Amino acid sequence: MWFPVTLLFLAGVAVATNNHEHAWETGNEYQYSVFGRTLAGVDKLKRQYTGIQYNGILTIQVKSPELLQAKFDNQHYAHIHQELSNGPDDFDDPKNVNYKRMPMSEKPFEIKLKHGIIRDLLFDRDVPTWEVNMMKAIVGQLQVDTQGENAINSKSIQVPSDESFAATFKAMEDSVSGKCEVLYEITPLTVNEIQAKQDRIPMPSLHSDGNHYEVKKLKNYERCQERQLYHYGFDIKSAGKKWAGQDKVISQLSVTEMVISGDLKRFTIQSTEMKNEIAVQPETSDSPIGNVYTITRLTLKKKNSISNSWFGPHEISNLESTGNLVYTFNNPFSDSDNRRVRHHSVSQNSEQENSSESSKSSSQSSSSSSSASSSSSSSSSSSSSSSSSSSSSSSSSSEEENENVVQTKAALQNIFLAPNIPLLPYFIGYKGKTILKSDKQNVMQFAKNLISEIAEEVQITSEGYEATMEKYTILKKLLRTMNRKQYAELEQYVLQFNKGSDSRANAWTTFRDAVLHAGTGPAYVTIENWIKSGQVKGAEAARLLSQLPKNVYLPTPNYVQAFFELIKSPMVTQQEYVNVSAPIALAELLRNSYIGQNYYPIYSFGFITLKKNDEVVGKYINYLANQLQQGYQENNSRKIQTYIFALGVTAHPKIISVFEPYLEHSLPASTYQRTLMVAALSDLAKVQPKLVGPIFYKLYLNENEAHEVRAMAVHEFILTDPPMITLQRIAKNTNYDTSKQVNAVVKSTLESLVHTKRSEWRHLANKARNVRYLVTSNNYGNWHSSGYHLDFQDWLVNGLSLQTIAGDDLIPKYVYVGVNSVFDFLDQPSVEAGYGLSSHRQFFNEISKQWYSHQADDERRRSRVEKLAQALQIKAKEQNNLEGHFLFNSVYDSAFYPYDRHRIREAVAALKQFLNGNNKLEGSAFNNYENIMSFANEDGLPFVYTLDAPTFTKAKVNFKQGGRTANSGTFQALIANNVQQQFGFVALFEHQKYIAGINNNRVLRVPVEYDVEFNSNNAKNFALKIRPQNLPRMGNELKLLHYSVVPFTTQQDLLDLKPTSNDKNTRPVFTSPVYKTTVQKDTFSIKVESDSIGKESDTESFVADVLRLTNANDDHYTKISTILTSDQIQKSEGHITMTYDTVTIGGNNDNSGQSSEEMESLHSISWKSNSKERRKQIANNLSKGIKSGEVYIFDVSYSVPMLHENEYVFTFGGMKSNSNQKLRGYFYWNSHAPQEVNYEVCFSHEMQYAPRATPLNFKYALKNSPRDEYKAVLKYGKTCATGNKVVITGSSSQSQQLRDIIENSSLPNNVWKRFQTGNKAVENCMKANDIAQMRDQIDVQFDLSNIVPESVRRYAKKIIEYLEKYVYKVCDNVSREEESEENTIKNTLLFASPVNRMWPNWLPQSVSDITSGWSPSFNSFGPSSESQWQTMRLNVADYPDEFESEKQSCTLDKDKVYTFDNQLYNVHLGKCKHVLLTTYPQDFHNRRNYIPENSKVAILAEDADNDSRNVYIWLGKQEIKLKKAGNNVQAVVNGQNVEISDKGYQKINGNEITFEILSLPDDSLSVVSEKYGINAVYDGKRVVISASDAYRNAVRGLCGNFDSRPNTDFVTPKNCLLTKPEEFAATYAMTQENCQGPAPENKRRAEQSTCHEFPENEQMNVISDREAGRMMTEGVNWGYHQANRNKEHGRGNKSHQNNKKQYQANSQESGSSESRNDKKKHNIVYRTRVVEEGDEICFTTTPLPACRQGARPTERYPKKADLYCMPRNDQSLDLKRRVEDGANPDFTRKSVSRMQVFQVPVSCSAA
């Protein structure tokens, strides 16, 4: 390249002859001494190394400038395994090093060059491949490109213009490790430098007329065109042909320094030294844990004329080409070397006239490669004794094109053969061949012995586990080298164990999981045979299939095809559990092998799977899609869920078109299923966000779509990192979107992303910060949908993602949790868990129905509420089938379990059966996680890094029933985990592995026995005795917990197959002398062995040191064991007693006159264990001064009586009083001996809330400033009475500044105007009440006694500081005022954002949004901002939707109703009872209008005389009537007038308060029922009803249906939506009960009004043709430039028309181009109808048309049908249940009882 520019600038001074070109002079012989060393060590801790060093003589004869002949002889090598104080660069011979002869052939070989660049090496055919690679490494050190033959054209090239000038350039150059970029630096040496480098210039007299140059070569391993590298478990990316680096775990640096004499055209290499360093730095470590160092030095000894020739005719004919310098592979299973011939090196800058030569050479190389491939294939086939029908003679084009492909066609196509991986130790450990070839070790017998040893050692009673898990790793790796016949031999060995014995079970578990984790073709065939033969089935088979994709080594096309055939077999499709895990496993296999190709070493070994996409789509994806369609045809929810999830796991774009008809409502699917489809698209969105993002966005924009689907879609859309403008649109839309659930997701997701620091979300986080101020300021409750993404500054866990979608209860119906860690793969979290459920209410009702018998329900009398629902003829909306799933996925395992109503019934029945008898549970399993990386080192020996992390889990549980109140049993568990990181190299010539690493073991053993007694009479008592189980064979000690970290170096014989911990050559790395100690505790002992704990450590520092040693980043030698001696085992029986009790404070309480000060004045308290007296004392203390309420007591006692006499007591009591507006708590703890107490802690606290402000009286709320007070007393010491005392007092109140703002604002005037209309309880007025009661100031004071130690004072101050920080995180500004006395600490905190109450809830951060002049940016409330405070004004009218109350409420005002869902309408009741709220039977197929007892609630109202209104509240069997009598309001309970005293009225049933009636300060009444979750406030005319979230979408009446959708509030009992409020209200009027007013006429009109359907989801074009991967057919007539657009999208030509016709034909075949009418007809199914009347159950004799699940009728017509009726009995009820489950019994032969007309659908459309 730049050599023409130099114009031979040294030619004038050179006196070389024409036969001297570059480094070699024809006819001469050069002799170099060779020294090499390779060492591995954990030198992060200590300079202790293991490895080899060798020497020899390399003689080179120059036959011509382009041909060299070489020979390496007199080779010797020595082992090094010791500490080198000066590090690996110390060239002084280490101590006690013994050299021995290296077993090399010493046969001469030829080297072909071109312009000094080595192009080919030819060796004798009998020379082993490992020797070839070592010689390539040595000879490669003499390759030097002084003329830029391979230089890369760039601006940084520095060309030498004179012999005194340096040269710098980059070249792409071969070496044994690969073809990578090399930085050349050529510098002339000065006289002083020559003097300093005399050892590097052994023959300075050569070229005496020339110069000496230093040539430095620095290799860049991140820019390689070719690498010989195998990896597994790493996601290595490559851009085009450029190597993009191995991973963060491995980094490599290579520097070569060469001294030459002469000029840059003709010179002699005096010496060369290469230093290579491989650093191992896992992501869990801050710095490299160790390194592998390689040093190779060549020094010129002689230069003479050629004395004799090495080659005769026979030797020449036996030479074969081995290609360029890059590492050569061979077939490890072949009896011969059968080398893979590499291509020749072609100079990058050769002249054009040489192009034909290069082409010819390349062609010859390709031909040789093809020949070798064929030979290798046949050899591999012959080496196996088994055959496969999968074999094929067809050639792979990818293999022919890429000579790097090391897999033979037989190994790729025949899954009965072991894979060919010639870089892993067990594949090349015996002279470059698999260790199975060795006659020194019977590997099969050794594998059998390993299985037996592991089976014995995994017994819970076994002792050591340090080596067990490593033995399992060895077994797993051995299995990878075996074929199917050898697997079968091992299987027969395992089956010879005694059937039913523990040894048989353990041996089977070991072999089964080792086969699973081997991950090869023969391993798969073995598992397939187990499943087909029934040897494994059910949950066991499902586990094997679910883990298989995580462990497969080479997912070849034949492997995937075989797995595909398996999942289609009846043994899989018809088997429980397996038919779920199998398709999901196939999907994961497709994702990893076709989409995650970087997971496998395709850039070194070629594409393992097919590159084309046709087979994936045409065969596998289509199969999954067809199964999904079949699931809908069968109405099989479990199958539908399974294949939705499986399709999503593939992350293939084809799934968009599969989900399209369901997401667009063209085909019926339930809301739950469509939500699951959107979630399934999230995996594809991570791979192709620009493709899937717009689909999510369009689903979100459709406000007629279900909120679950929209919430899921918008959350996933935000995570696709959309453009800023779109994110702004979403944020702003939260102020207008009517769905609070969707808005809550947007707000929570954006707010959490604002604080994330994860690199992958950096751009998204910046966008979230920019749009956060556009988001609504509404504060949404915990029950709303949400999305949270958190960061963790931890070495292991990086982040946490949480997504919830709200449902019909407080519990979300969809929850997803993802944990990101260093083990993330393919953008997937390391751990995923979650569940989905269509309806919690249905779920729990189904469980309750199956768990408790309801046989007596049909006979008992119906309640008042049930009769009301029947009288109104409330018809439950037909609900979707109950369906749901559980999900768990990790690097170890995955599980997806879908269920429906039938599975819940089966699960409940199985659980009941299990709990009612003596049963055993037992299970064990190995789990596997590993990373592997191996590549050719610069010395020609394979470098290997492995991370193996097997885990073994075993559990045994025995249950023994001892009657209804007692049981006993045993529980044994064992968890063993080993994490071993090893790195080093393999010396193939001696089957030795030199490795360093860190071995980390963790073992947990829990063998216990227990006895349980419980009594649930008055107080609930629970007594537990638990003791260690004295296991046999445990000796004198029981090791409960073991933790060890052992850094080590070793030299290991690969044929010994021993764990490193058992190898005699293994040497732990000690950084200092090891200190051993044992610390005795009462119940256990701790043994510690470490090199980082000193003898001088005291007890306190010792514990801290032990905790420090367990830090995952500490790699020092450590062993910690927690043990029980035989004496401790006998004495370690623990006794635990727990008691729970409740006390109701009611009308008989005589403590009302005592003050609250006495609450904490217990001067003495019963201190003995399980003291009934103590519980009574605490209960009495909590109830003092309380008018009514409930007290809860929880008491725990713990002792180990045989070990020590001390016992421990913990008692907690809590009290809540609605009448007193108080919360109290009492905490007591002590340690005591049998006769005296040793230490006591007493803590009491009380929260006194401000008097309850009525929501119906703004005047009172404005006049009375709120103030909540808090007091706590802490006492501790020998006794509470004599010990230290700390008093904490606090209050939350409304500051004077805020009070002035409210009173001087327009708020009061606006409210008075509302009052003039007679409506005091409409929305704005109630919110004004809440604003008037805001708190914005907290006062905290600590009073300390004189004897309180200084540490307690520091803690008190820290509490204040923490409170400030917490408040600051929530609020914008905090003002602090501190006043300290000697024993008093006072603080006042002033909030910028007021709160509604002192502790429980915070209002939105930007409460300033509701004001017209409240600035949120104050830093303090000092004098400088006083004027700003004075200018603040509140204007509630400007902010009707900003303030959210703590609980949703419904209000009946003078002539208006304000519903739960914020719908306001006029109403006139008249003297006619109207139902404001009532529950109703939720089950559409309810057999008798049954309503659960705790949901039997109804509230009615009617106008009365004197401009008043009567209200009726029904709670179960209780009836409360609220009416106005004169100027007072009165309560009538069950027909009896009751007097409401200052402590209220309580209705107590047993020991439970059913409800309370309280008098409020403005004389209105409040009815509170915590049992039923209802609160009603009544003032004689108006009523405000608050209901818990349990009533969402579960009520009807004038208050609406409480489903968060205002447009569905006017729903009638018959599920029709009306538009006129007066007609809607009349449908809930009790017109049959002496009704006076407009209701009867309005009800008649309502019956004649048009019945509008519920607003269902409309069809919408969510997915375009392009997104679905189809030919564009949309928008043909849209726009003014159709021609250009058609041209752009391939339309408007004959080819397009033909494609379009073909597409339509294909669509018609698949049913996707059906007409709209056809689709509507397909949505019709035929079902038997059930009619219940009186004591009869009737069935239609023939099935009638009905809409498919998820569809709704678009047109109906009347149809007469015959009925067959049966008496109501068990037989008819069972038949009814069968029909409801989908059965269509044949009643055509039954007698017709009567006829009835039904409205049946003509057509149905998707909901």
UniProtKB/Swiss-Prot annotation:
Q: Where is the composition biased (Polar residues)?
A: 1700-1714
Q: Name one Pfam family in it.
A: VWD
Region (Disordered) residue spans = 334-402, 1635-1655, 1684-1723
Q: Name one GO cellular component term.
A: extracellular region
Localization, UniProt: Secreted
Q: Where is the Vitellogenin domain?
A: 24-819
Q: Which residues form the signal peptide?
A: 1-16
Q: List the disulfide bonds.
A: 180-224, 1450-1599, 1472-1635
* SUPFAM superfamilies named in the record: Lipovitellin-phosvitin complex, beta-sheet shell regions (SSF56968), Lipovitellin-phosvitin complex, superhelical domain (SSF48431)
Lineage top rank: taxon = Eukaryota
Please give the chief subcellular localization of this protein: secreted
Alphabetically sorted, this entry's keywords are: Disulfide bond, Glycoprotein, Secreted, Signal, Storage protein
Q: Which residues are glycosylated?
A: 354, 579, 635, 1181, 1304, 1373, 1506, 1693
Residue ranges with Low complexity bias: 346-397
Q: Name one GO molecular function term.
A: lipid transporter activity
Protein's job: Precursor of the egg-yolk proteins that are sources of nutrients during embryonic development.
Q: What protein is this chain from? A: Vitellogenin-2
Organism, scientific name? Solenopsis invicta (Red imported fire ant)
